[in-house]
């Protein structure tokens, strides 16, 4: 009888898991709001949580702003969480609605398949290393005591972290963003108090490298919640130059008996965790450095080879450290300095100034000879095709880059949707700098600034016209020629047999997030490919067929070009069907952010007191 009762108590239902996660979200958001001073202290009441054996601050709906935040949580976030659509909740405090971030609290959710015998969790090592590991545990081993312990630990760690940060600025904006699992979330789904988020709105912008910390995770068998924090209000800020290596995990338990300082928290021997900067100098009593601080010589050699190849492919004879950081954002500052020292020893570089180098390409015998592209009068048809494709790729790159404020390798590579390698994208950006479309100076986080002038505007209009003509010609050939005609086949091969939505010219016109309404079933996934062409696309693993979607009204310059013309023409065109693996990245943001100013808050409190 006693054993049966213990077994019954140990069972965790899906409803229990959902309620625990919901309560954890409430506790976390309310404590963030209280400790970071987002609302006056009188807006909070003390509340005891028996399940977690701790007291918390509960936010009360004292005015429209506090009520709005509660509605976001109780009616919006919970709706997406209950339906298992929610992938990430971003609780953001920024300078203004579309301005730079101050702090970001990222709550990630996963829904393990508890029908099986195991729950798997993939862990990726932070920094420049690419190692990862998978840990598996039996689902029945997750007990209520383990859940309670993990939840308490995560909340205490979060509270301890926030108390070490600097005070919030007087003027700030509070908002939430939701990211979804695209394979299960309907395209037209929007939770209450949220609206569809544009592509540029889904990306948070930082003016400086934030401090990054992993607070912890809670596995409640049916739901796994993980929390990460970013903040620019680090009192120990050293500009966070090691942004890639500064990801600190606050929930790692150590078997070693490490010494604790006054700034560290030691709640118990079973639940010890450390709040300390990972500056690479912390050692245990045994004098050994942690595994994350070790270096991988093979990986360093790979990174050095990539940087060396990129330097040799450039036409300029000078090099700035900032150029390397912009073109290789995944490499930390320390690693870049090590690579520069290696290239100095190899003779490829010569030091000009403190952070400037001159390039000696001939002095490096290990670097393979890279031919520069030269436009020649007499070229063979094959070379002419290559040059034509290169010009077309450059036009596509300009088409996506010119409307931007800042362009980076990662951003442009994503816009081109895999049509060009990252090395090719770097060369395209260098060409834009030489042609005067992009400034040579760079911001490490944002990239290189795009020059907006009459010349660039005219160039953008030129490119639009050229691409429209190319699309019209491609569509005329696709609709008039038979699938088996050699002329059609030759034409498509010259255009690399693109799928129908790209029209052999422009891959992914506009933002993926603006194409969120599918056509009716008879017209869904219409493609201009047929027979042999469709099978050719399917065999190419690097390119996913793109279905044609009904585009809603578009305001941005990047996503609003060519959409309606292509779509109207495709509506009447015949062709075979191909599958679509939901390539869009759906996201939501709040309909009305909370704009906070201290003066307005004081006036509201005075009115309520009266």
Swiss-Prot record:
Example of a GO cellular component annotation carried by this entry: nucleus
Record keywords, A-Z: Centromere, Chromosome, Meiosis, Nucleus
Compositionally biased tracts (Acidic residues): 243-262
GO biological process: homologous chromosome pairing at meiosis; megasporogenesis; microsporogenesis
Comp. bias intervals (Polar residues): 522-535
Free-text disruption phenotype from the record: Failure of the pairing of homologous chromosomes during meiosis (asynapsis or non-homologous synapsis) in both male and female gametophytes.
InterPro entries: HORMA_dom, HORMA_dom_sf, HORMA_MeioticProgression
Comp. bias intervals (Basic and acidic residues): 263-272, 485-499
Region annotated Disordered, chain positions: 236-297, 477-507, 520-551
Tissue-specific expression: Expressed in anthers and ovules.
Residue ranges of every copy of the HORMA domain listed in the record: 15-229
Compartments it resides in: Chromosome; Chromosome, Centromere; Nucleus
Gene3D superfamilies: HORMA domain
Main location: nucleus
Its job: Essential factor for meiotic homologous chromosome pairing (synapsis). Plays an essential role in promoting homologous chromosome synapsis. Does not seem to play a role in chromosomal axial element formation, sister chromatid cohesion at centromeres or kinetochore assembly in meiosis I.
PANTHER family, A to Z: HORMA DOMAIN-CONTAINING PROTEIN 1, MEIOSIS-SPECIFIC PROTEIN HOP1
UniProt protein name: Meiosis-specific protein PAIR2
